[in-house]
Amino acid sequence: MQLLGNRNGVFPRRLATQDYFIQDPRYLQCYADMFCRFIDLYKAEGLPITKVMYQNEAYSYTPYPGCPWTAEGAQRFNNDYLAPTLRKHHPEVELWFGTINTNRLDYVERTLDNEQLQSNIVGIGTQWECRDNLPQLRKRYPKLRLMMSESECGNGAMDWKAGEHTFFLLSDNLGNGVDEY
């Protein structure tokens, strides 16, 4: 897999053609149940969870261990397992879709155009390359809120230039309709 060089403005270069999360109902329900278990455990420590997203960077096809999902797998898990389980055990917790870290708008739309999914989520969590899609997402899904779910840490310099970049990201995201960070 080529990881360096020109990406032709697209991230990731390749999308997963299969779900890396095992699509057996037992595993899917167990994963949904674990969300509720973590919500319970955090609440017991005085840390209420108000919103969840099913997977960080679910569209990164990486050489290191990750968990890419197909559009169909993401819809299946969120619609058939996570949303109903949250409604039953934690109706106070919002379900957001994300985090979306790809600028492959065609793929994002293929996932989010599912009406059942739209009715199950409150908003869309975006980060990194997905920032390129914010105007289109805002227009296509006006009832869904947008969240900047992660900031770009770059190379970790933590210097003034990195601070300026983070300020730019916040400004750009807010200017494109993001109302959560």
Predicted regions located by residue number:
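Catalytic-core region of carbohydrate-active enzymes that cleave or remodel glycosidic bonds
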Residues: 123-181
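Substrate-binding cleft and catalytic face of glycoside hydrolase catalytic domains
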Residues: 1-109
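Short flexible/disordered coil segments
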Residues: 59-76, 106-125, 154-168
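Alpha-helical scaffolding within the catalytic cores
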Residues: 36-38, 79-81, 101-114, 130-136, ...
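Alpha-helical structural signal in soluble globular domains
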Residues: 41, 45, 80-89, 110-120, ...
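Detector for Asparagine
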Residues: 6-8, 56, 78-79, 101-103, ...
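Aromatic- and acid-rich polysaccharide-binding/catalytic face
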Residues: 44-56, 93, 98, 109-132, ...
